[in-house]
């Protein structure tokens, strides 16, 4: 059985389409890609998260738990009340 791991920064738009770029890309790189493809910004309805190695999109909080279980991070980075994952925490 393969251990779930966080593989890529991703953004899900209002229609549910997921845009992702492999590491070491960050979420701003994904947003730039979306802009290049003509996706109109509506950040209030976009979800920033990650793609897992099984292809599933998860939000930042879910990704933090996956990364912790997979040993990709040693603890959930709780600073300034942050309990979610940033790409900077991984790569």
Q: Residue spans of the language-model regions?
A:
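Linear-motif-rich, low-complexity cytosolic tails and juxtamembrane regions
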Residues: 1-47, 52-91
């Amino acid at each position: 059985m393969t251990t779930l791991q966080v593989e890529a920064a991703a953004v899900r738009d209002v229609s549910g389409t997921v845009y992702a770029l492999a590491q070491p890309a960050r979420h701003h790189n994904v947003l730039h890609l979306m802009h290049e493809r003509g996706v109109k910004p509506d950040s209030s309805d976009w979800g920033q998260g990650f793609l897992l190695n099984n292809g599933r999109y998860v939000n930042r909080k879910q990704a933090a738990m996956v990364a912790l279980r997979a040993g990709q991070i040693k603890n959930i980075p709780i600073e300034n009340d942050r309990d979610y994952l940033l790409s900077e925490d991984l790569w």
